Amino acid sequence: MKSIMTGNEAIARGAYEAGCLVAAAYPGTPSTEILENVASYKEIYSQWSVNEKVALEVAGGAAIAGARALCAMKHVGLNVAADPLFTLAYTGINGGLVVVTADDPGLHSSQNEQDNRYYALHAKIPMLEPSDSQECLDYIKYAFELSEEYDIPVLFRVTTRVCHSKSLVTLGSRQEVGVKEYKKDVKKYCMIPGFAKLRHPILEEKLKRLRELSDNSPLNQIIWGDKRIGIITSGISFQHAREVMGDAASYLKIGMSFPLPERLIREFAQAVEVLYVIEENEPYIETFVKSLGISCIGKDAFPVCGELNPEIVQRVLSPEKATKTYAVDVQVPSRPPVLCAGCPHRGIFYALRKYKDAVITGDIGCYSLGILPPLNATDTLICMGAGISAGIGFEKAFAQANRDTKVFGVMGDSTFFHSGITSLIDAVYNRSKLSVIILDNRTTAMTGHQEDPGTGKTLSGDVSTVIDIKEIARAVGVKQENILQVDPYDLIQTQEALKQAYEATEPFVIVAKRSCALLKDVQRANTKCTVNAEKCSKCKLCLRLGCPAIAFKEGKMAIDESACNGCTVCMQVCNLGAIERTGR
């Protein structure tokens, strides 16, 4: 049977067909849909973990126990999971272990453009790299076999375009492999220094065998065409090159990106007149090719920054035929990202504007949009968890300079569970004056409303224990009187809490609790706001909320009732009572 699938759907299907039994992940674009689709296969136990490190440890434990296991994350998630990744390379596995890393060239939804191919090189584990959905399915199945044959985790690298593009896939049936017998082996699985020292040379021997495999792997293939131009490439870059050049070039398509196939590269390079290496972001393949003493054209012609596309490739390989593939003459209005109408974060950021002398350290989530006009409410955004820990650093630096500058650390509920708890402990332990604002919108909203430990539901929909953020704050040492919960739709309550937090001289926590506006609050389903033109002075104060439902049109203020979610924050901002509630 055939089906049209995204790369993420095909990865999930491949895991199912391979007999995978356990899967764990933390949501992050462009990888999120992998686990969501895996969860549709009831034969596989699937879970959202609190962060990528935990997810890989869960999957790693399952693999050592004898089950085939999969772990998925976006590229920056592998930074979080690097600790177990490197050690699992030493221990090896029992059942197959595949770690999917979804890189994001072009930074569609990320804070950096790191190239995770270097993780395979650094951790010394094999890496596969598909170029379309069919290969996503086939390569995942192969990855599990490779993992078990070589007793090693396999890194599976995809990129945004592979994850989200659709292509035709041939489906197969599930292979039931069961759970292998687990045998206790402390010298293999307990990495104290003495045992780890013994495992390192074993890993090096595996690498020698993997290098031989790469030279003979069907995943690395030569496609002969015109030998005047030779192209070494991998992943989505192969699709771009093939689209532009067709049979007017020859290709060495790399499907096993580590170890790279040295013999195959030498043979291919000798057979072509001019050699190009086409890859997104870092010159990973190019550096290896040049280390073999082979001359090639790579990043001196292709950009390091951003995605590649057929137009960019054509400008280099065939400039005389260059066409503006993606250019359009139509001028469309810009649509910058904004917090949704009725977003519960808006009230907090609006209220924070009062404290112009304060520093606000932000974090990763929908609330990252608080950086942008008209809210302009955030000073830094580094990585998950840094909303609190970077705030501690600011506060300590200001103290060293004898500056009494207030610092607010802002993060969401899922981010708090991910990596904010340890940061809050650090704030308490080191007696920081930081005030923390946790925006609890009852979901992991930015990646598509996944469950988290605060929702009381698991990925499969089972009822679980609700982890109370206020109780965590109290448990790690924040004083009871320094923990407040507010409804961010209530501006007066929110402003009073922020005033206390601003004046606090010890760790202070505000939990702003209100469900994401897109979760369709039943109580406000019929509530809308409208502008009373007779009362409105056109002061445009309401526009400072940055709500996409509010606009100044044809010389007057207007609220788009089809977009309004009835949060009523604009009503509270208007000093003239010109915004009124409609419905019930």
Residues covered by each model-derived region:
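Thiamine diphosphate
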Residues: 1-133, 161, 224-225, 248, 371-511, 521-522, ...
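Short helix-loop-beta junction
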Residues: 37-43, 242-252, 471-479
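Short acidic, glycine/serine/threonine-rich loops at helix termini
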Residues: 34-37, 60, 81-85, 107-114, ...
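Conserved thiamine diphosphate
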Residues: 104-153, 159, 186, 194, ...
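A glycine-rich helix N-cap at a beta->alpha junction
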Residues: 43-50, 91-102, 179, 184-187, ...
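Flexible, low-complexity linker and terminal segments
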Residues: 1-8, 18, 130-339, 344-347, ...
